[in-house]
A protein has these predicted regions:
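Conserved alpha/beta-hydrolase "acid-adjacent" motif
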Residues: 321-327
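Conserved acidic catalytic loop of the alpha/beta-hydrolase fold
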Residues: 139-159
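Catalytic histidine-centered segment of alpha/beta-hydrolase-like enzymes
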Residues: 348-357, 361
Length: 379
């Protein structure tokens, strides 16, 4: 009997050791794959035949902005073209890994020199010693101003274009309020307006939809939160129930074919980042959500930001509830600007630049042709 027990224990131990060995091997393989996929260098821009475009730019840079070193990428098929500074969303979530993952031949970089900046506290610009005092809206505004001046000097421009998505659209509004003289025009994607109300509208939509399809699990999760409470939206709601249901119902980051796993993989396999940048992306997203998101929640642009000295153009997905399409429509109608416009993307949710990239590029070209002169002959 004792021999049988010992035999069973030995075999159980062997199985456990085998499982541990396999897990360790898998982890090592994943680390090696990630390391290989993290050279910290962007691929060169190529034409339709796969040939490198002469004179094109595809680079990673770090400079001091404000009081810390911050990183950004610059991509352009022709550096003489007009310049766009792209402000990512999140806050704390640079989009270039996702943009490149769905990139088509008709890309912004064919007509513009585009700077994708990792804002302070995330990705290349993550620093472990950054706290709430280092992450104010004014810090971001001043950083954007300084980076704009760097781009103007480097590329010999009197002005550039400013573009922002989600949180970046909120930041963009604040930037053009303070420094309108630096920009030809502002373009907001998924334009933030009154985000606290937007979150309430999104909650109501998800609750109604869950009731319509009789989805008890979703109703139970939503029932844990009160959209009229003072602390709404709570951090756990934002990271859990809200994100899950928005993406499931096609009203979040994208209308179709989106998963958080695909987003994570886009970031992890992004060759423009080093391993430390990928760690900084994850940690920075949490840092910004805890310290920056609520600046946007507490502000109502209908009251604080309505008069501008630069043209304002809004790109919004019809199905976007992550940032309300209805509120963005109202906002465009009431603001004062030298020129303004709303472009509705009828197949998109929150990311029309990635969901309908060809039309998005066409509209941006049209705007630039209005304010900058013809860039290329019309197709």
């Amino acid at each position: 009997m004792v021999l049988i027990i010992n035999w069973k224990m030995k075999n159980t131990l062997k199985v456990i050791l085998w499982i541990v060995a396999v897990l360790v091997a898998l982890i090592l393989i994943m680390v090696v794959v990630l390391w290989i996929a993290s050279p910290g260098k962007l691929p060169l821009l190529k034409d339709a035949e796969g040939k490198v475009i002469p004179g094109s730019i595809s680079e990673r840079r770090e400079i001091i902005l404000g009081d810390i070193e911050q990183g950004f990428f610059i991509r352009s098929e022709n550096p003489d073209n007009p310049v766009i500074l792209y402000l990512h969303g999140g806050p704390g979530s640079p989009e270039l890994p996702m943009i490149m993952a769905v990139e088509e031949r008709e890309r912004l970089e064919k007509y513009f020199t585009v700077c994708y900046w990792d804002q302070r506290g995330t990705g290349m610009s993550y620093r472990s010693n950054l706290g709430a005092d280092d992450l104010t809206v004014q810090h971001y505004v001043d950083d954007a101003r300084d980076l704009t001046k760097y781009l103007m000097e480097r590329f010999g421009k009197d002005k550039i274009y400013l573009m922002g998505l989600s949180w970046g659209s909120y930041l963009g509004i604040k930037v053009i309020e303070q420094y309108p003289e630096l920009y030809y025009a502002y373009m907001g994607i998924g334009q933030v307006t009154h985000q606290h109300l937007s979150e309430q509208l999104a909650y109501e939509y998800m609750l109604d939809h869950a009731n319509e399809v009789n989805e008890h699990k979703a109703l139970k999760k939503l029932g844990q939160y009160d959209p009229l409470s003072e602390g709404f939206p709570q951090l756990d709601y934002l990271m859990g129930t809200r994100t899950t249901l928005m993406n499931k119902y096609g009203i979040g980051i994208m209308r179709e074919d989106f998963s958080m796993f695909s987003l994570v993989m886009d970031v992890m396999m992004f060759r423009g980042y080093k391993m430390c940048d990928k760690v900084g992306y994850v940690r920075g997203s949490l840092l910004a959500l805890e310290n920056v998101f609520y600046f946007m929640i507490d502000d109502n642009l209908f009251e604080s930001s309505t008069n501008f000295d630069v043209p304002v153009y809004i790109f919004h997905g019809l199905y976007d509830y992550q940032v309300s399409y209805a509120l963005a429509t109202e906002y465009v109608n009431m603001i004062e600007a030298p020129a303004k416009g709303l472009y509705t993307f009828e197949k998109s949710a929150h990311s029309p630049n990635m969901e309908e990239p060809a039309r998005f590029v066409r509209v941006v070209r049209d705007i630039a042709e209005l304010h900058h002169g013809l860039i290329y002959p019309l197709d």
